[in-house]
Amino acid sequence: MAVKSGARSGRNVVHLARPTLRETLGRLAPGTPLRDGLERILRGRTGALIVLGYDDSVEAICDGGFVLDVRYAPTRLRELSKMDGAVVLSSDGSRILRANVQLVPDPSIPTDESGTRHRSAERTAIQTGYPVISVSHSMSIVTVYVAGERHVVPDSATILSRANQTIATLERYKGRLDEVSRQLSTAEIEDFVTLRDVMTVVQRLEMVRRISLEIDADVVELGTDGRQLKLQLDELVGDNETARELIVRDYHANPDPPTAAQVAATLEELDSLSDSELLDFTVLARVFGYPSTAEAQDSAMSSRGYRAMAAIPRLQFAHVDLLVRSFGSLQNLLAASADDLQSVDGIGSMWARHIREGLSLLAESTIADRLA
């Protein structure tokens, strides 16, 4: 594990590869031993200060208390938290190492907290890099400090209420995505695609991705209470990430099919767009390498065929890539015979017939859907 340490403005701040907020919330989720201990503390109307990790940086700010080094148990955490000092757990949370400790972090580390316990928690988290939990006995609130972030841990009912509203929004987004994706598929078969058609699908794919991340964070925080929510999320999102990759492969402005690195860079740039930029098709066009003008939105496009052939059962990506690089576009693939397909190195007669039948069925079903 890479370790970098340094001091800034007189502050002894240690930068280590430490747990993220997401990882920490997973450890605090309902159904986990740590959450059980926190619930017992809340029910007992006592406060607590808990450090989730131990090394020399934690040892350096510990004053007093006593060494335990015993197996973690929710009941033990509850009893030890009755004392005024902090409880220090091992990095994996399996053992209670110290109790009734006075934490003395660097007072020059800035904090917006007002209470003594919360100020110590935030400064300790910043200085050591380990997550620190503060339980307020007066307000019955659990706050976790990690990676420079402050997060109040809500109860499951609050998270579920919020997540159910977000799921309803995701359902609307997914319905619209399915609609514009079908329209694009029809336009591809009829060779009547515009840049606006493509950017509409790109926008909707990204909107689904972003809202699904919000729900996924709730799933992590819910723990065992989020199983049903997780099933709903997985069903709605489906293969959204694959669809994002395929549309980049089909429509990136690069003259040749984009490399894996180019696809990854394009998706990363899409991820970095602000919500307002995501609503602007000219910005999306620029990400794909096209002119960022309103006039360019009516430009004719031609699919390379990655999306279409992904719908053919059992067809491997390696075969799809070979065919796209050989024929250049979906229209050329649709016009190719089984013999033409077989002429590509790596495509045998059986695969050629399978692909030819798959493309024919795809064209027929797409046109039938439009007429229905």
Curated annotation (Swiss-Prot):
Protein name: DNA integrity scanning protein DisA
Organism: Mycolicibacterium smegmatis (strain ATCC 700084 / mc(2)155) (Mycobacterium smegmatis)
Regulation: Diadenylate cyclase activity is inhibited by the interaction with RadA.
Gene: disA
Cofactor dependence: Mg(2+)
Signal peptide interval: none
Record-listed ATP binding positions: G85, L103, T116, R117, H118, R119, S120
Assigned EC number: 2.7.7.85
GO biological process annotation, one example: DNA repair
Catalytic activity: 2 ATP = 3',3'-c-di-AMP + 2 diphosphate
Pfam families found in the cross-reference section: DAC, DisA-linker, HHH_2
Taxonomic superkingdom: Bacteria
Keyword Heme included in the entry's annotation: no
Keyword Manganese tagged: yes
Enzyme's top EC category: transferase
Induction section of the entry: Forms part of an operon with radA.
SUPFAM superfamilies: RuvA domain 2-like, YojJ-like
Any GO molecular function: ATP binding
PROSITE patterns: DAC
Subunit structure: Homooctamer. Interacts with RadA; this interaction leads to the inhibition of the diadenylate cyclase activity of DisA.
Function, in words: Participates in a DNA-damage check-point. DisA forms globular foci that rapidly scan along the chromosomes searching for lesions. Also has diadenylate cyclase activity, catalyzing the condensation of 2 ATP molecules into cyclic di-AMP (c-di-AMP). c-di-AMP likely acts as a signaling molecule that may couple DNA integrity with a cellular process.
